[in-house]
């Protein structure tokens, strides 16, 4: 077997309207499908960016809270590539999305700027040049 790509990433959120507004209206993801699953008491949004990254969001009432510190095993954050972190920060801020400070990724002498921001349920998101 040979793995060829990451097909999608799945996260859990609690509020449909806030999640839809954040990922679709503010970040520009396209909706692939949006279905309610009454038997599971949830809703599933499958979203995609132009370059093929798919994000599957399960929206359910009162999901377990994301543990931030001490860090837990599992998904730590999602990172998206951008051409310019400072320009991306301006773009996010113009849409009402707060960001953290610009940090420098010094791993392996990369020395590229990164910034974190959070989705409506606190999932850490990173922008990386």
Regions found by a protein language model. Give the residues of each.
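Exposed loop/turn and edge beta-strand positions of beta-sandwich/beta-sheet ligand-binding modules
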Residues: 5, 41-43, 74, 111
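N-terminal beta-strand motif that seeds the catalytic metal site of vicinal oxygen chelate
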Residues: 1-18, 75-78
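Short, charged/polar surface micro-motifs in flexible loops or helix N-caps
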Residues: 50-54, 62-63, 85
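Conserved beta-strand in the GNAT
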Residues: 56-58, 126
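Mid-chain, well-packed structural core segment of small domains
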Residues: 71, 78-86
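Core segments of cupin and vicinal oxygen chelate
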Residues: 11-54
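A short, acidic/glycine-rich surface segment
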Residues: 32-33, 42, 62-68, 101-102, ...
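Vicinal oxygen chelate
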Residues: 2, 89-129
């Amino acid at each position: 077997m040979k793995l060829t790509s990451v097909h999608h990433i799945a996260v859990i959120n609690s509020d449909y309207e806030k999640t839809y507004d954040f990922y679709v209206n503010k970040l520009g993801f396209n909706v692939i499908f949006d279905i309610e699953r009454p038997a599971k008491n949830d809703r599933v949004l499958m979203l995609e960016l132009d370059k093929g990254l798919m994000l599957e969001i399960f929206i359910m009432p009162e999901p377990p809270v994301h543990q931030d510190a001490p860090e837990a095993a599992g998904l730590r954050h999602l990172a998206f590539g951008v051409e310019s972190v400072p320009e991306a920060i301006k773009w996010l801020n113009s849409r009402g999305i707060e960001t953290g400070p610009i940090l420098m990724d010094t791993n392996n002498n990369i020395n590229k700027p990164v910034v974190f921001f959070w989705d409506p349920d606190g999932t850490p998101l990173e922008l990386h040049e």
